[in-house]
Amino acid sequence: YIIIFKINIIHARSRAPAWSCYFASLITRRIFVTTFHGTYNFKSNFKKFYNSIMLRAKLTIAGSNFIFDHINENYSEYLSREKKLRVIYRGINIDYFNPKNISALKKEKLKQEWDIISNQFTILLPGRLTYWKGQEKFIESLNILIEDYNITNFQAIILGSDQGRKVYTKKLVNLVQRYSLIKKVKFISHCKEMPLAYS
């Protein structure tokens, strides 16, 4: 397909496909580019080698300064002058996420579905339920708002699927119960319209 469709640049955004893309780029002599998104687990040397595919490109894009520093601190042996590492921040479609494009009717309907109280601040944490997305820290922060600062005029929504990680979901629910935040925190597993959720 690379030759048939006259593709000049092969861009991989995750590790498993990056390996096949890397070898395809060698065979077809095309430019190989990767985007390094997260702090991949590298407890073993094999895992670190597996992750290193993201740095075998002519250009590796780090999605943030944090990831840039993480790469330099943990994968320096895979960096060289020939292979460039650059920070390019992820963009958003500002028209798609413009709150002016969301009707008042849709907003009201979502408030009813999620049982949002109008006279309280709403704090939204979107993202799949996983340790490195920070839901535990989020819940702990809510407890600090109440215990240390006596701020109670809020409600929090943790929006995202656990993708089968039931043990982690149970851990979060237990944390909410431990801090007596049951009336403050709602878990919503899915939302088709993220611009609506943000609005």
How should these model regions be labeled?
Residues I2, H190-C191, L196-S199:
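Short alpha-helical donor nucleotide-sugar binding micro-motif in glycosyltransferases
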Residues A12-A18:
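Short His-centered aromatic/hydrophobic patch
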Residues F121-E147, K170:
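A conserved mid-protein helix/loop that constitutes part of the nucleotide-sugar donor-binding site
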Residues T28-V33, G38-A57, D69-E77:
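Nucleotide-sugar donor phosphate/pyrophosphate-binding loop at the beta->alpha transition
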Residues G160, T169-C191:
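Nucleotide-activated donor-binding/catalytic signature segment of Leloir-type glycosyltransferases, i.e.
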Residues A57-V87, I92-P99:
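A short, active-site helix/loop in glycosyltransferases that binds the activated sugar's phosphate group
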Residues S76, N98-D115, K171-N174:
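A short helix/loop element that forms part of the nucleotide-sugar donor recognition site in Leloir-type
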Residues I92, P126, Q155-K170:
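Glycosyltransferase donor-sugar binding loop
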